[in-house]
Amino acid sequence: MKNKTIYYWSPFLTEIATVKAVINSAYSLRKMSEDFEVTILDAAGEFKKKTSEILQKKINLLKLSNIDYINFLPKHGKILSRLSFFLIFICSFFPLKKVIKNKQPDFIIIHLITSLPLIIFYFFNLKTKCILRISGYPKMNWLRLFFWRIVLKKVYLITCPTKGTYNYLKELDIVNENKLKVLYDPIINVNEILKEKNKQSLKFEKNYAIAIGRFTEQKNFEFLINAFKSVVKEIPNLDLIIVGKGEQKKLLIKTIRKNQLEDKVKILEYQKNIFPFLKNAKCFILPSLWEDPGFVLLEAAFMRCLIISSDCQNGPKEIVEDKNAGLMFNSNNLNDFLEKIIEFKNLDNSDIKKYKLNALKACRPFTIFTHGKNLKNILQ
């Protein structure tokens, strides 16, 4: 029997959680069955640093350009990053169309810069089936709504990372309901985490809470730093470590100084292995304005790190609130956040164990194995 060929399309400027999801998804199919031949498309050289990992996992990597022009594109700022995405769109249009037409993969799963393959599939009659993967919470404006109403007619399926996003798209009524599927992201690689969790290059003697993510408006770390001035009054022996990188780094440092928290709040550059930090933290705080589902939230849950999360759409509500897997505060609400901090301070061991166990159970749908099994069923 002929192997099914699956292509992944997900160009990116900076390494975000979606990149990990793409590689893990491709890997999950390879692990699930040898009947799948899986290829990641490299539009501009963005996957170059991931080549060894991709090949080690027996995933093919197909370059669409001989030049790694990703190195010359601006990566931060709304206007400059959108300009970079536009350039990738223009430079990849004909190479992507040619590859799909000539190679004729059975499926192409599209994660980022999805407008390009959506337009190609709308205007050209191709044998390949296109699956749109919703990566992150879809913010709808009239232009995207209009665009999706037109181009989604040619899409084979749309997979949603949470039930909340599934229900949201269903209510919008922009596509046949039969095309919508819930497919949880492959966030938890159990074997990999077990290997990495004890490898720690930095050690902290003090008790600390931890927050992890890109330094962007979405992650809302400025709110957390401002709030931590009050947290210190409630729990004087608790420090805060924020791990990540991004365009708001200078703003966050300025906010720390403004609140005179230099001795209590530390910023660490992006860490490839965050599991030891989660393992030793007293709690994980997620102050985000939106997440779908929230990769690091699930990694914290798997590491048995007590979760204090905002109630932002969509993932945290489904993971933390619905599963009783931690403490949840009203997003961007200082008073409610401080109430949850006081509740955290007064938790007894039985409550802590209950939250941690529920959080661990909530991780099950997000393992590589579960994702691979469910994606295999979708493709067959």
Residues covered by each model-derived region:
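A conserved mid-protein helix/loop that constitutes part of the nucleotide-sugar donor-binding site
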Residues: I16-N24, N207, A211-K233, L240, ...
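A short, well-ordered alpha-helix in the C-terminal region of glycosyltransferases
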Residues: D336, S350-P365
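N-terminal strand-loop element at the rim of the active site
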Residues: Y8-I16, S28, M32-L83, K179, ...
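Short hydrophobic beta-strand element within catalytic cores of glycosyltransferases
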Residues: L306-S310
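Short His-centered aromatic/hydrophobic patch
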Residues: I88-S92, I110-L116, I134
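A short, active-site helix/loop in glycosyltransferases that binds the activated sugar's phosphate group
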Residues: V155-L180, I187
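Conserved acidic donor-binding segment of nucleotide-sugar-dependent glycosyltransferases
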Residues: D322-L334, E343-N349
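Aromatic "clamp/platform" in nucleotide-sugar-dependent glycosyltransferases that forms part
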Residues: Y270, L289
